[in-house]
């Protein structure tokens, strides 16, 4: 849609990623405060979470670079790389998070206070993931890197792509809308203290991906 830089090396994709990260941090803070999780534990969750996010971004780039290398024989990583893949980032981020949570947590909390509020963390995590992911998908739409099949009109969107100019199914836009709806659903469940958020997220997003892909 508009992959060009707005100023310096900043484009709409990077702005959306930043908005997603900030939104996830705000949600984590506000929601855990509502559950009366101690400040020290919240800060620990935040630090480990931010580190996991950044490592997830790296692993998302790396996973896509490996896939691109297998497909084309060319390894591209970083600013001029092949892009990112969500599942590569999710797996890498989760691994780093658990290492930090159980490894570093044992050092910081002698009485395992961070584990005491683990259920609250797992309840809020899908809320943070969905809102951040939603902004990320909008960023993908602006970058023009992902789109569906060519169409004659609605529900397609007029786009300039490597496959030509015309109406293409804006899969990232519809996925962003779905993710924001899923964020609202998991938020309601969180505040009602119905801690089925991870199940709702995994099943809901899994079904959505199957629907949008096939």
Which ranges hold each PLM region?
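Hydrophobic, membrane-interfacing alpha helices
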Residues: 1-214
């Amino acid at each position: 849609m508009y992959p060009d830089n707005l100023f310096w090396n900043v484009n709409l994709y990077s702005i959306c990623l930043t908005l997603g990260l900030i939104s996830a941090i705000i949600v984590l803070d506000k929601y855990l405060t509502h559950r009366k999780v101690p400040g020290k534990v919240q800060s620990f969750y935040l630090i480990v979470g931010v580190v996991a996010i950044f490592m997830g971004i790296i692993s998302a780039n790396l996973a896509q670079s490996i896939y691109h290398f297998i497909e084309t024989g060319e390894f591209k990583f970083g600013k001029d790389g092949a892009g990112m893949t969500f599942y590569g980032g999710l797996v890498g981020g989760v691994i780093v998070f658990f290492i930090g949570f159980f490894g570093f947590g044992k050092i910081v909390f002698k009485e395992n206070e961070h584990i005491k509020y683990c259920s609250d963390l797992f309840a809020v995590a899908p809320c943070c993931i969905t809102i951040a992911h939603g902004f990320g998908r909008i960023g993908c739409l602006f970058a023009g890197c992902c789109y569906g099949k060519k169409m004659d009109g609605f529900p397609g969107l007029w786009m300039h792509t490597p496959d030509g100019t015309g109406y293409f199914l804006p899969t990232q836009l519809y996925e962003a809308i779905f993710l924001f709806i899923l964020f609202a659903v998991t938020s309601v469940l969180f505040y009602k203290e119905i801690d089925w958020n991870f199940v709702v997220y995994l099943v809901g997003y899994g079904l959505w991906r199957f629907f949008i892909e096939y």
